[in-house]
Amino acid sequence: MRVSQMLVPTLREVPAEAEVVSHQLLLRAGFIRKTASGVYTYLPLAQRVLKKLRQIIREEIDKQGGQELLMPIIQPAEMWLESGRWHVYGPELFRLKDRHDRNFCLGPTHEEVITILIRGEVRSYKQMPLLLYQIQNKYRDERRPRFGLLRGREFIMKDLYSFDRDEAGLDISYQKMHEAYTSIFSRCGVKFRPVEADSGAIGGSSTHEFMVLAESGEAAILYCSDCDYAANVEKATTLPAAGLDPAIQQLELQEVSTPGKKTAEEVAKFLGVEPFQVIKTMFYKTDKEVVAALVRGDRDVNEIKLLNVLGALTLDLADESTVQQVTGAPTGYVGPVGLENIRIVADMEVMALVNAVVGANKQDAHLINVNPKRDFQPEIVEDIRMVKAGEPCPKCGAQLLEARGIEVGQIFKLGTKYSKALGATFLDENGKEQPIVMGCYGIGVSRTMAAAIEQNYDKDGIIWPASIAPYQAIVIPVAPKDDNQMKIAEELYKALNQAGVETILDDRSERPGVKFKDADLIGYPLRIVVGNKAVTEGVVEIRQRRSGQTDLVSVKDSVPKILEILPTL
């Protein structure tokens, strides 16, 4: 392909709407254009990258026994009502009506469609295991679409569903997909980590996210400095808290005045104690009740863990009026002692505190020498706190480190959540009806393209890994009007393509500097410059985009040299 014949509308200025690097560079390098908020048109260069991503995904999934199908984007509301998710999914679900006033949605996921399909087609254990997948557009009505392809309202996804007769079979399918995803992202040339995660609205028992590591990542992950443990901050745990120290005497409960001291740090400083000796009491409203959550003063409540512990559908921090109504005191002076008709959920660390400090449920007052079990009894004691870098790894005890990541894939063990809700059953070896055991596995294809850029760029533009670059090499004749230069450039362009190197020829009548800037902006892994030396000395310049290394190579040796370099990029 020749640049003069292509639609590659590069921009010199950074578009005002672009907040993150990938969005800026995808616009500037002519990969995408905005159609509406969170909706983009993919131009030819982007399509080439997406095609390569799809191909890598297909090859690795098919290798594990996957079968590709294609499901509809428009899904009838009846399916979602049957599964119970029509109301759970909330305003992010694009809902629409047809001319007959029937409700539909644009699919953000396809659990309902695939499960109901299998319900009608699979009746025997002999028909499983099954691994069925599609690569399809998905839709989510984001409140505030931003960051280009990283948080859009229309996006491209690969979603796969596994169907097994039992949990042991699901474990095998899950491991197959874990291996496939590891191979996929390795082949894409990105640095990534699989991390333990929360299953969210999809549901299920076990899940891992695949995170591309990037400083601009929206998610924080914690990983062990010694072993393979890694989890996002919503899921991360640490070693269990130490038990009560029997050597410490429990003192008599007392009320003390703490005028104007509301935060754990302010109270601790005023009373001359460490912040960890203060118990923070946070009130939350679920879909059913108001609950009190207790953590140490130097910790924060992990709302995802709390939501899961409560088994609630929704969880929001209670407003000031609710706190006042429940406790009779303003926020900052509330505590668990004397609370009535309120469920108390305590973090495990709280139960190890002796002679702690809590709010007295009275303006400008706190209680000291508070001891769990003696002075208050939580209904639930679980891990409900945020874990931070520097704490010990739950597997080996080494230090946890923090990194930022962009989620590009997630795998779930759904179990029988959807098969039971939707009646997808099979007959086992004994002729007994059993629910099908399911898993689901997603990859954000368009998101992976953006994430790769967030990890691979410099001041001049994108630095594509060779495996997913739109073209692997670009041949640039310095003076296209020089017949001798153009002849060498044309021959080299043809020879590289014949050798299997995806090569583009910049035959435009532009200044060399303009061509070089465009090549760096777009991010071709290799740039081959055909200048006057190619004519007079028979050498061309081969420049590697990532390292900037430049080699002068004879024209006749240039193709073998490029074939040698390419696998390292």
From Swiss-Prot:
It is found in: Cytoplasm. GO terms for biological process: prolyl-tRNA aminoacylation. GO terms for cellular component: cytosol. Keywords: Aminoacyl-tRNA synthetase, ATP-binding, Cytoplasm, Ligase, Nucleotide-binding, Protein biosynthesis. SUPFAM superfamilies: Class II aaRS ABD-related (SSF52954), Class II aaRS and biotin synthetases (SSF55681), YbaK/ProRS associated domain (SSF55826). Coiled coil: none annotated. One of its GO terms (molecular function) is ATP binding. Consists of three domains: the N-terminal catalytic domain, the editing domain and the C-terminal anticodon-binding domain. Homodimer. Catalyzes the attachment of proline to tRNA(Pro) in a two-step reaction: proline is first activated by ATP to form Pro-AMP and then transferred to the acceptor end of tRNA(Pro). As ProRS can inadvertently accommodate and process non-cognate amino acids such as alanine and cysteine, to avoid such errors it has two additional distinct editing activities against alanine. One activity is designated as 'pretransfer' editing and involves the tRNA(Pro)-independent hydrolysis of activated Ala-AMP. This is Proline--tRNA ligase. The gene is proS.
